[in-house]
Amino acid sequence: MNTHKQEDIQLVIITGMSGAGKTVAIQSFEDLGYFCVDNLPPSLLPKFLELMKESNSKMSKVALVMDLRGREFFDSLIAALDEMSDLGWITPRILFLDANDKVLVSRYKETRRSHPLATTGLPLEGIAMERDLLEELKGRAQMIFDTSDLKPKQLREKIVAHFATSQGQVFTVNVMSFGFKYGLPIDADLVFDVRFLPNPYYIESMRPQTGNDEEVRSYVMKWSETQKFTEKLIDLLSFMLPSYKREGKSQLVIAIGCTGGQHRSVTLANYLSEYFKNDYYTHVTHRDIEKRSRK
């Protein structure tokens, strides 16, 4: 039996220019708890909507990437959107990602990929064709994001700001690793010093690695000191985070520091971000991971 109400279902269709950031966008929606499908053929959209309708609360938030593959694909998508309007029980929001031609060409050169519509291999040819095909769809979009001057992180933050707000999930937990030798992070709300934990730096095989590597992670986490510390830290943060959110704070920066910001702090920052991601929107940054002492 269907228990969905129209206002309970959120369907976002992500489309736009090739190279404008649809991959980053769909990953951002996944982090927001959306059920995501990449490159769903428009001909399957009506059946997919029925599945949504019958799934009760299991598919109440869905994001679909609809890429352009040619005129036939585009015509099918427009027809599917018209059919959705006739259904009456769902109103999708269309997010159109765009960027200027110069930026799109630059991105194609960086990735060494060819534009899907460019028959001669020249990106500008495909870009011009795509703009023409997408003109009507862009006109239907409720939101148009110009990503020309946005880095992937900034696009992610923009999507979160727009779509998390409507869900009441505006509280963001930013977890940052850093090295004390490079100074304290000036934007940190909470700072935890993990220099008391056993240091993988002194094991030659792990020195060039970081806390993103499994060998280092396992080494750091195997010690009883680490396990007791993480247990107490999670208990403390589980108490504090709801209070910060209740007070109206939009984001919290938790900084985890070790000596150089390579091993222990990276491991613990990843651990915290992973632990709290089901309750909050979390984002992890490793401030000093690219810095290496030169001797």
Curated annotation (Swiss-Prot):
Binding of ATP, residues: G16, M17, S18, G19, A20, G21, K22, T23
Keywords: ATP-binding, GTP-binding, Nucleotide-binding
Residues annotated for GTP binding in this entry: D67, L68, R69, G70
Entry-linked Gene3D superfamilies: P-loop containing nucleotide triphosphate hydrolases (3.40.50.300)
GO molecular function: ATP binding; GTP binding
SUPFAM superfamilies referenced in this protein's UniProt entry, alphabetically: P-loop containing nucleoside triphosphate hydrolases (SSF52540)
Origin superkingdom: Bacteria
Role summary: Displays ATPase and GTPase activities.
Family membership: Belongs to the RapZ-like family.
PANTHER family, per database record: RNASE ADAPTER PROTEIN RAPZ (PTHR30448:SF0)
Protein name: Nucleotide-binding protein BPUM_3115
Species in which this protein is naturally found: Bacillus pumilus (strain SAFR-032)
